[in-house]
Structures are given as structure tokens and as C-alpha cells.
Amino acid sequence: MQTAARRSFDYDMPLIQTPTSACQIRQAWAKVADTPDRETADRLKDEIKALLKEKNAVLVAHYYVDPLIQDLALETGGCVGDSLEMARFGAEHEAGTLVVAGVRFMGESAKILCPEKTVLMPDLEAECSLDLGCPEEAFSAFCDQHPDRTVVVYANTSAAVKARADWVVTSSVALEIVSYLKSRGEKLIWGPDRHLGDYIRRETGADMLLWQGSCIVHNEFKGQELAALKAEHPDAVVLVHPESPQSVIELGDVVGSTSKLLKAAVSRPEKKFIVATDLGILHEMQKQAPDKEFIAAPTAGNGGSCKSCAFCPWMAMNSLGGIKYALTSGRNEILLDRKLGEAAKLPLQRMLDFAAGLKRGDVFNGMGPA
């Protein structure tokens, strides 16, 4: 078991209202390991490096996890990226074991794409509010009421929900895929993030029925307070993740996935940025652009309070101790039913093939050749 002290955070998930019925989501919680001191962290990193070699394993981490884990992944030849980059890296890497530092759906996606590999996670209880807010039974019932519609789901969903879908998308390729489907005259069901779905619907004009889920982090950003902060820093570029509410997105100079926001922060000439996404991304932004200033976008109104305060509590459950425990014990393994994995792989692989085509420039993205 992990020995680090753990702080517990409890969240009463809001009532998720679907277009057809209400679905009460169970109370969600996160138990976050305390940050180790420098000596302990260095010892754990050395032990993990040796274990990764011994187990023929590679560390695949999301931008939102502890900076110590992000740095360790890069130091050991692993990956730090958004969910699309993580999925692609894990599928292409030769390692027999993938240690996925992120939330549960990311580990499931890795197992779906690589059923022959062992997929471990630092903590199997690292959830996602979007996943929790889209129960498979309720979502399937909703889809069954609209059999003429193509089902497109965000990657932040369970394997069971992916298996019900025609397409899986990430924020990196969602606009392009929906534009492509619209060009084919297809009407869509979208789930689970209502803000991202609404943004894509406005940008593409696609006919989309939206599931009403949201990200506990991005849902808390406030448009009015962001406008006031922007007025205080008129020279700042506003970077916004599209899981944010419309009032926030409309203030963004750059709207896109974590990878797109990182690229903008590094490549743009401006020296000041307001960042409306999980603040875990600031570590890589500051590493790649040390001469620039990054300001956190507000997550609560005047006199208000925030639940996540721009840090995903489930991402924070990933720890060095958890990685060591998974590697030494072989526990915390992602296991999926074979038939479920095969069904979920079809829409997920469809996305990866489409994204690869975009990179080659030979896929129509709804707006002309990519």
C-alpha cells in the first residue's frame, strides 16, 4: 500500500440533466497524496527508474498530473501529453507495460488500444467528472431514442460508453471530425461535455444533441471575472480550453486542447498569458517559455468559492508512491472484458486513423484539405 499521507476531498456531483431524464450521480471523492519532501522524491524517482527498466515499462503522463511525475516521464523516455498524444504514444511504444499517470479513462483507452500490454495506474480510483456524469446505461437509452444519429463521444468516457459510440474524439481533433461528419450530412449525438459540444456546434453548425455533462475544473471558470482580469492585463493573450462555459470561450484569443494552448504559449511573441485550464499545464509552459508570465484565470465569482480551483482532484491522486506501488506489486492493473475492449476499439481507432490522415494532409476536415 501507499505510505504517503492522504488528504480527502469530497464532491457532491450535481444532478446531471439529460435531454430525456435526470440521472443522479453518486457522490464523488478524491484522496490526494501529500507532496513528498525532496529527499523522498529523489529516492522514489531513482527506484521507479530502475523498476521501469526491470519491468520493460514506460511512463505515460498527462499534462495535469504532478510536475514530479511529468519530469520523470520525460527523463525515462516516456510521454507527457494530452489524451490523444498519450493514446498514440502508448499504442506505438514497444514497452510491454504502460504506466498511465492520469485518470481512469486514460488507462482504459490504453488497454483498449493495446490489449496485449499490461496497463498499470498509480491509483485506479482516479476518476473524471465527465466519465462519472455519463453512465453507460442512461447514455445508451438516450442514444436508442435517436437511432438515426451518429454517436460521437469525448475520450473522457468509460470503455462501455465508447463501445456504444460510432466515433471517439479528443479536443485536439473534435472540430475536424465533427466538420467532416457534417459535410457527410450526418446528424449527431454528442456526449458528455455540454460546453465542448456547444462550442463545436457553434463553430461547425452541425446538428447535435448534447448530453449535459461537465468538467469539474473547467465548469468553474467565470466569464465576468475573466473579462475583469483581462481588462487589468490588456496585453495578455487569453488561452481557453473548450470545456469551459461559453462566456469564457468567447473571451479566448486561443481556444483549444492542452497541446494547442501549450504550443500557443511557446510560439506566440507575447510575454503574458491568462490560462483558463487546469493549472497543471503551467509546469510545461514555464519550462518551455521561462521568460513569459502565466496568470491563472478566475474560478469563482466575487465572494464565491471554488471546488476544484483549477486543479483536478483526481489527477492529483497520481503520486510517485503510487507508481512505485503499481510496478512492485503488479496491482492497479486495468482489466477489460475482451468483447467490450474490441467494441470500444473501433471508434477509438477510427479517431486515431483520422488524426493520422490529418497529419498527412489526405483527410477532408469539412473546410478543405487539411
From Swiss-Prot:
Subcellular localization(s) per the UniProt record: Cytoplasm
Keywords, ordered alphabetically: 4Fe-4S, Cytoplasm, Iron, Iron-sulfur, Metal-binding, Pyridine nucleotide biosynthesis, Transferase
Main location: cytoplasm
Gene Ontology terms for molecular function: 4 iron, 4 sulfur cluster binding; metal ion binding; quinolinate synthetase A activity
Chain residues that bind iminosuccinate: H62, S83, Y154, A155, N156, S171, H241, P242, E243, T258
One GO process term, biological-process aspect: 'de novo' NAD biosynthetic process from L-aspartate
Bound cofactor: record note: Binds 1 [4Fe-4S] cluster per subunit.
Catalysed transformations (reactions): iminosuccinate + dihydroxyacetone phosphate = quinolinate + phosphate + 2 H2O + H(+)
Pathways per UniProt: Cofactor biosynthesis; NAD(+) biosynthesis; quinolinate from iminoaspartate: step 1/1
Chain's role: Catalyzes the condensation of iminoaspartate with dihydroxyacetone phosphate to form quinolinate.
Protein name: Quinolinate synthase
Lineage: Bacteria, Pseudomonadati, Pseudomonadota, Betaproteobacteria, Neisseriales
Gene name in the database record: nadA
